[in-house]
């Protein structure tokens, strides 16, 4: 019997209680962030991405942010990802890190395709971002511009929030 896919295993795991989620009881450290990045890179992006500098901390207005640079970081990536350190559940964390990795792909990989066509690099929620939607869904991930908190607590379903 084949080993279960680690992304799908996380995404299909039972959700914690809503009370637990509202306390943002799922906390991530460097080991969890690195593991999540590696499995998403392996399964969704076919190891095309280089591990960027990833920082976790208090974020008030966003869950995650990918910031592009025209100068490579020591990791070899031209991006830096900032993530919250507190999450409703592991599934929410996986969706956000995968979302930010889609932006990293736009900046680190797709920038060369755009340059060949005389275009500037772009990090947006456009066609080059949503081309990953089908690949995400194969692993139980949902690719959207943003997930709404209120609707999440109403439905507990990423496709509805």
What are these regions (language model features)?
Residues 5, 15-92, 108-161:
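Metalloprotease/metallohydrolase-associated module, dominated by Zn2+-dependent proteases
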Residues 1-12:
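Intrinsically disordered, low-complexity N-terminal tails
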Residues 95-108:
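Active-site recognition of the HExxH zinc-binding catalytic motif
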């Amino acid at each position: 019997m084949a080993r279960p896919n680690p992304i799908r295993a996380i995404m299909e795991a039972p959700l914690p209680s809503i009370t637990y989620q509202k306390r943002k009881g799922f906390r991530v450290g460097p080991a969890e962030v690195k593991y999540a990045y590696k499995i998403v890179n392996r399964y969704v992006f076919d190891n095309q991405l280089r591990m960027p500098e990833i920082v976790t901390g208090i974020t008030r207005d966003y869950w995650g942010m990918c910031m592009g640079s025209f100068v490579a970081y020591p990791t070899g990536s031209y991006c830096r990802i900032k993530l919250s350190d507190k999450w409703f559940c592991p599934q929410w964390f996986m969706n956000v890190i995968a979302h930010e990795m889609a932006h990293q792909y736009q900046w680190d990989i797709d920038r060369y395709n755009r340059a060949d066509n005389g275009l500037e690099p772009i990090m947006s929620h456009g066609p080059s971002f949503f081309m990953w939607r089908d690949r995400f869904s194969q692993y139980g991930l949902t690719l959207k511009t943003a997930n709404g908190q209120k609707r999440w607590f109403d439905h507990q379903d990423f496709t509805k929030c």
